[in-house]
């Protein structure tokens, strides 16, 4: 999930916290661990316009962490209501991210979530808290 977490970087995951919008989470998908940002919470409506702007329940979501505001591949029908017990996640590099916009990944269940990614510990020149 670039630009926040790059390939080969090592991060710390805090287990046991309920994900909130904007949190970066690690979750299991197809015997792999993916890192994405929580966008939609259970029961919310998520919509993405042709310019890549994200709306939650009709309100434009402020995403200062995004540099690549693109729709990317989207195989779900928008607007999309997040099912109970699941979270809608997007990668920060929207044009290439495999995330909840894909029916292959879909919304992430609470059981899939390892925890919140809070700290990058490798490489040493990029050590620090993630936002």
Locate each region found by the language model.
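Soluble "head" domains of membrane/secretory-pathway proteins
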Residues: 2-131
């Amino acid at each position: 999930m670039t630009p926040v977490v790059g390939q080969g970087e090592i991060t710390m995951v805090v287990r046991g916290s309920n994900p909130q919008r904007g949190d970066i989470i690690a979750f299991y998908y197809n015997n792999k661990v993916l890192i994405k940002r929580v966008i939609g919470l259970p029961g919310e409506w998520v919509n993405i316009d042709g310019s890549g702007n994200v709306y939650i329940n009709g309100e434009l979501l402020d995403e200062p962490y995004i540099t690549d505001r693109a729709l990317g591949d989207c195989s779900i029908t928008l607007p999309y209501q997040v099912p109970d017990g699941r979270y809608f996640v997007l990668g920060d590099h929207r044009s290439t991210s495999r995330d909840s916009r894909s029916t292959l990944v879909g919304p992430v269940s609470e059981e899939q979530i390892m925890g919140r990614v809070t700290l990058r510990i490798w490489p040493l020149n990029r050590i620090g808290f993630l936002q």
